[in-house]
């Protein structure tokens, strides 16, 4: 009698994805982040569900409902902080996952890569809308500033912004629809993640060398299930350290002040994971130009497969490209720092230089480095 996991229609799918999946024998811990993202998403959906049971999406009661969750609901505080800091862990894993893809040339799996970019955009949209829900000062003004960017679109901009707002300013209608979208998007993300996995399993995983690994495969279970459990344990440890010791470390103190349309905070800034894009947006004096740069800073990932000029897939044996990659990482960290600083000298010029560097490294320096390495292969 054959095993039920290989014959049952549903079990067969699980088996082929997580048990008998042929995986390269040499994938490193950088390949853990996919499963960690799955854990993050599940955690966010579960904690979010329990928060939604007590939250009210009304401008008059939203702030106090969040306070009520923290003070009066059984373990409400831990659910709230797991959800808030879970978003930070989610983005750490996302950035690591994308960085891994860039370093090891995983972007040559076109469908998987493009679905991944859509997932990144969807996650960013979800996080932004979630940040608006507590209805603190930063929630309100963040929503006002970011939605206002759409008014830079010629001709239809103003109408579009008012349509999204559901009125002439960020108000009750805006909060209600943001809650609705924030609730539904994670389920769309989950569906997209399944498609992402479907496309990945058409080709199989890449590996650190970038060389096809068809001749050397091992079953996913038990080798990578145990490795994923270790990664998950470390993720939960990091998250709980954050939640139980410094839950407000990554938040903004301004968000503990209820939203007041008559009082603008001195420095409007998004959560830390958007600061790099915010710095790029602010570095361009023109509104439309800034918005385009903001979108392109993420959309540039679509071009990665077409900017790949190297004869080798991975950067493992390409020291010049490795240097370029780490300069890019340093540049992104610089942009993240600048995004949180006030708009004054010397931060303005540093932000502008870092923004120019960002696009220059990806569009010019990395392809040139690859071409030089191709020439060096002939030596």
Curated annotation (Swiss-Prot):
Localization annotation: Mitochondrion inner membrane
A Gene Ontology molecular function term for this protein is:
ubiquinol-cytochrome-c reductase activity
Q: Which residues cross the membrane?
A: 33-53, 77-98, 113-133, 178-198, 226-246, 288-308, 320-340, 347-367
Q: Which UniProt keywords apply?
A: Electron transport, Heme, Iron, Membrane, Metal-binding, Mitochondrion, Mitochondrion inner membrane, Respiratory chain, Transmembrane, Transmembrane helix, Transport, Ubiquinone
Q: What CDD domains does this protein map onto?
A: cytochrome_b_C, Cytochrome_b_N
The record's Pfam families line, in alphabetical order, gives:
Cytochrom_B_C, Cytochrome_B
Q: Which cofactor does it need?
A: heme b
Q: Subunit comment for this entry?
A: The cytochrome bc1 complex contains 11 subunits: 3 respiratory subunits (MT-CYB, CYC1 and UQCRFS1), 2 core proteins (UQCRC1 and UQCRC2) and 6 low-molecular weight proteins (UQCRH/QCR6, UQCRB/QCR7, UQCRQ/QCR8, UQCR10/QCR9, UQCR11/QCR10 and a cleavage product of UQCRFS1). This cytochrome bc1 complex then forms a dimer.
Per the similarity annotation, which family is this? Belongs to the cytochrome b family.
Misc. comment: Heme 1 (or BL or b562) is low-potential and absorbs at about 562 nm, and heme 2 (or BH or b566) is high-potential and absorbs at about 566 nm.
Protein name per the record:
Cytochrome b
Source species of the chain: Pseudois nayaur
Give the organism's phylogenetic lineage: Eukaryota, Metazoa, Chordata, Craniata, Vertebrata
